[in-house]
Amino acid sequence: MAPHPLDALTIQVSPETQQPFPGASDHEVLSSNSTPPSPTLIPRDCSEAEVGDCRGTSRKLRARRGGRNRPKSELALSKQRRSRRKKANDRERNRMHNLNSALDALRGVLPTFPDDAKLTKIETLRFAHNYIWALTQTLRIADHSFYGPEPPVPCGELGSPGGGSNGDWGSIYSPVSQAGNLSPTASLEEFPGLQVPSSPSYLLPGALVFSDFL
């Protein structure tokens, strides 16, 4: 049976006569025609084995890049740790230097026996504490001995404002007359009961030894 003549005919459709999808606007048709093919599309002639090789190669490149960046980050962290440690060591060194300078200045004012005695830090602090306490007690005892309670005056010597002359009474209790006798020598002559200690007994030479302050 001979083929139908219509089957042998081929219909050629030009791009101008090709109809778009039903319901699509001219703008959508133009955008679809002008859109370039996606780069992620795999060519048809590329086999699956080649695609696997390409993916494996990209993974290896990423791993190499990550391996190169990782040592850099670790190196930066180690440098940062060393910098912090160095700053902390510098602060501690300065603190100890200031402490040693202060202790040396304190040793310079303490009466050590012998003079070239080298005290440790704790010995210096203990000696300074005890030395300050001894000086405080010395001043307290000296003040108590010098400004002690006045001796009682006999009743027969007490006068009254009405008895005797007003000049004697005013000369005794007048602030002006007392202001002129403020020297320690005059006070001792008027009140023989007051005695000024020459020096405390525990400050005499040989009374205290250097070990008493430690």
Swiss-Prot record:
Keyword set, alphabetical order: Activator, Developmental protein, Differentiation, DNA-binding, Neurogenesis, Nucleus, Transcription, Transcription regulation
Name of the protein described by the UniProt record: Neurogenin-3
Compositional bias annotation for Polar residues: 11-20
Known partners and oligomeric status: Efficient DNA binding requires dimerization with another bHLH protein. Interacts with ATOH8.
Disulfide bonds, paired cysteine numbers: none
Entry keyword annotation includes Nucleus: yes
Function statement: Acts as a transcriptional regulator. Together with NKX2-2, initiates transcriptional activation of NEUROD1. Involved in neurogenesis. Also required for the specification of a common precursor of the 4 pancreatic endocrine cell types.
Any Pfam family the entry gives: HLH
A biological-process GO annotation: positive regulation of neuron differentiation
Localization per Swiss-Prot or TrEMBL: Nucleus
GO CC, alphabetical: cytosol; nucleus
Gene name as annotated: Neurog3
